[in-house]
Amino acid sequence: MASPNAASDAATPASVDLYRDTPVRFLGYANEVGESFKPLIPRVAYLGTYGVACAYVAADANDKYQRDGDAARGVDALIWQALASVIVPGFVVNRVVATAGRATTRPMVPTFCGLASIPLIIKPIDHAVDAAMDASLRPYVLKTPTASD
């Protein structure tokens, strides 16, 4: 996954980022799994997946802030993660599941389509969010390095 500060997030043994370079990263995709299973699970379970993903986003943003006390870096991580891990992929998977649900009467097909879409959408969304933030928030509001810096 790309990151708000890609240049400083190189995965060397001394600088492994718990939230970006380890299996903890998968917690950010909990809501996409919830979107995939939405037609089959209770609403409280579906909403719980968003709780897990939002907690992950908040933890990563807090970690980025705590590392060097730079509030802009924490806000950058919060916005980037919210967009790239929760909002945009949640919307995309929701639409995949809804579209598949209209195309079939088999209850598991939309779930499988939603789950199958997750690995396909991650990188394009990450890059799109990086590009959008590099062209707007990072240089003008947050004054943080762009993803290509």
Predicted regions and their residues:
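Hydrophobic alpha-helical membrane-associated segments
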Residues: 113, 117-124
